[in-house]
């Protein structure tokens, strides 16, 4: 599905959750504890909106339902700034820990909440921690039944928490859902994440820039970049957790804003739906 554009339009996405929601801290912080933490998501999203406005860039914000319920003005602020609202589920639970019935309830509640707040349809979904895997592909059928048109939950890499390395690396149809995976680069018969979250924080920016150029110019495909508001917040409270979890979460927070700004300067970005409409195929929202 190549793009019909001279200079590639890439997708920029933000997973709107707070620092205490992450899977890395799930053994230390239960959902019942969330309300006891000082939220920082409003401040961090406001910073992101300022950066995007300065660079005249639109993005898709995959908003957690729990966040939307507590901060409805924040969701409206994002939408009023011209950005697309996507759904990140309600309770940030891995899909493999949910029954199909529980998953349906979670996404239905979150999607309806978001649509009520912005008075627009919500077509895009991303699972917490990219947790649509080979074992949970049934979730795509539920997403279609619940009204979603685009999914960005299948990460074609090997990882201890997620991943489906055999999946297509670029936008493709899975039944009637358009799957738009996070960007990877393929080397030595393996796919490697390069353009989002911890990959973006940990890798030198030059590698990320080279990888996106390879995807755009050599493979002639759009990139999918993602990050979280807490990744631009080096002053966030520290949570006691095992070293591996702390390394994944806290490393290079102080350099993330600069990397995001460099990406916006070096590449063209739009929302997920904007990029999908540029694909040389029928518009997925009307497919």
Cite the ranges covered by each PLM segment.
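C-terminal domain-boundary segment and adjacent tail
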Residues: 2, 203-287
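Active-site beta->alpha N-cap acidic-glycine motif
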Residues: 2-81
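Active-site-adjacent pocket scaffolds in enzyme catalytic domains
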Residues: 3-4, 116, 120-123, 127-226
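Distinct, well-ordered alpha-helical segments
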Residues: 25, 71-78, 136-141, 165-166, ...
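The substrate-binding groove and active-site-proximal loops of carbohydrate-active enzymes
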Residues: 31-39, 62-64, 91-103, 128-131, ...
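Generic structural signal for well-ordered alpha-helices
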Residues: 45-49, 72-76, 104-111, 140, ...
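Metal-dependent polysaccharide deacetylase catalytic core of the NodB/CE4 family, i.e.
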Residues: 55-136, 148, 153-156, 181-184
């Amino acid at each position: 599905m190549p793009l019909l554009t001279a200079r590639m339009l890439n997708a920029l996405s933000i997973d709107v959750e707070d620092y205490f929601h992450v899977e890395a801290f799930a053994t230390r912080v239960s959902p019942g504890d969330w309300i006891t933490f000082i939220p920082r998501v409003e401040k961090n999203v406001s910073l992101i909106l300022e950066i995007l406005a300065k660079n005249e860039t639109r993005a898709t914000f995959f908003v957690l339902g729990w966040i939307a319920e507590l901060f409805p003005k924040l969701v409206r602020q994002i939408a009023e700034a011209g950005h697309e609202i996507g759904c990140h589920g309600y309770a940030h639970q891995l899909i493999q820990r949910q029954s199909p019935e529980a998953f349906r309830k979670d996404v239905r509640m979150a999607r309806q909440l978001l649509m009520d707040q912005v008075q627009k349809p919500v077509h895009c979904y991303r699972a917490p921690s990219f947790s649509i895997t080979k074992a949970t592909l049934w979730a795509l059928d539920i997403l279609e039944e619940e009204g979603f048109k685009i999914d960005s939950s299948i990460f074609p890499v090997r990882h201890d928490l997620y991943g489906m390395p055999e999946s297509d690396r670029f936008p493709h149809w899975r039944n009637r859902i358009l799957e738009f995976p996070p960007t990877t680069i393929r080397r030595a018969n393996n796919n490697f994440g390069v353009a989002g979250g911890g990959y973006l924080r940990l890798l030198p920016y030059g590698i990320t820039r080279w990888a996106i150029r390879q995807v755009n110019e050599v493979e002639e495909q759009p990139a999918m970049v993602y990050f979280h508001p807490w990744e631009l917040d080096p002053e966030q409270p520290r949570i006691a957790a095992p070293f591996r979890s702390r390394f994944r979460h806290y490393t290079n927070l102080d350099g993330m804003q600069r990397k995001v700004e460099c990406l916006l300067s070096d590449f063209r970005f739009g929302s997920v739906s904007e990029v999908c409409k540029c694909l040389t195929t029928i518009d997925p929202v009307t497919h």
